[in-house]
Amino acid sequence: MDQRQFTKNLRQNMTDAEQLLWKHLRAHRMDGQKFRRQQPLGPYIVDFVHFAQRLIVEADGGQHAGAAHDATRDAWLQSQGFRVLRFWNNDILLRTDAVLEAIWAALHAQSPTSPLTPTQVVTKD
């Protein structure tokens, strides 16, 4: 299966957490900001990306590849000028408002006031 077909398959089979997050990010619903879902970037496919702000949002769950893979992936994405926010699916499902606040804060380059912070934030120095 080529990357384009694989990406289409991911869009059609999103996790519950990805679907919930997409409901809030799609169609400029977050403060007029444009996100894309299941977007190929180089050798990777990211869950959500805001190209203008160079921000990637990842939903991590049971199928998650692990910390070593994330470190390699995030290092490559960072080298391309992106910031990466990672949230556990459980947080997206149970603490949706806090997750959305953390994303909003990252879009506006502010620290979140929420007690929830992303599991990992990678910023380019």
Label each PLM-derived region with a short phrase:
Residues 1-33, 107-125:
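Solvent-exposed, charged helical/coil patches
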Residues 33-34, 82:
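A generic structural motif
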